[in-house]
Amino acid sequence: MRALWIVAVCLIGAEGNLSQFGDMINKKTGIFGIMSYIYYGCYCGWGGKGKPLDATDRCCFVHDCCYGRVNGCDPKMGTYSYSFQNGDIVCGGDDPCLRAVCECDRVAAICFAENMNTYDKKYMLYSLFDCKEESEQC
């Protein structure tokens, strides 16, 4: 448990889009994104395998697929430009790669908000060892 706390603290203070993504999740859902989604289901957090467990986990699966299509920058570390306008997330900036990363995060944050009713605490801190079904293709 101590190791998980250290990871969480490091992520909260992370520069780049991991902290930006957490901010988007917080603004769209009203909950603290990093802690609520970091090890949720089979796809939220680093890595992923098996079939998504619910619609919330599917948001993470789609987000992973989106990151996989980004070329030219590190999706987890680059800092992108975004703003909130009338409750909407608006991605900006001149770098097409970072804008693509922002769009991945924006779509995932909206997906989390639209699927909050599927969020199940039993999938928090879920072990990838329990994700045994064949993985889906993006």
UniProtKB/Swiss-Prot annotation:
Gene Ontology BP term (one): arachidonate secretion
Primary location recorded for the protein, binned into one broad class: secreted
Subcellular location: Secreted
MF terms in GO: calcium ion binding; calcium-dependent phospholipase A2 activity; phospholipid binding; toxin activity
Tissue: Expressed by the venom gland.
Disulphide connectivity of cysteines: 42-131, 44-60, 59-111, 65-138, 66-104, 73-97, 91-102
EC numbers for this chain: 3.1.1.4
Binding-site positions, Ca(2+): 43, 45, 47, 64
Cofactor(s) in the UniProt record: Ca(2+)
Taxonomy, superkingdom: Eukaryota
Top-tier EC class: hydrolase
A cellular component term, taken from the record's GO annotations: extracellular region
Record text on cofactor binding: Binds 1 Ca(2+) ion.
Keyword NADP (UniProt): no
Keyword terms of this UniProt record: Disulfide bond, Hydrolase, Lipid degradation, Lipid metabolism, Metal-binding, Secreted, Signal, Toxin
Annotated function: PLA2 catalyzes the calcium-dependent hydrolysis of the 2-acyl groups in 3-sn-phosphoglycerides.
Family: Belongs to the phospholipase A2 family. Group II subfamily. D49 sub-subfamily.
Protein name: Acidic phospholipase A2 PL1
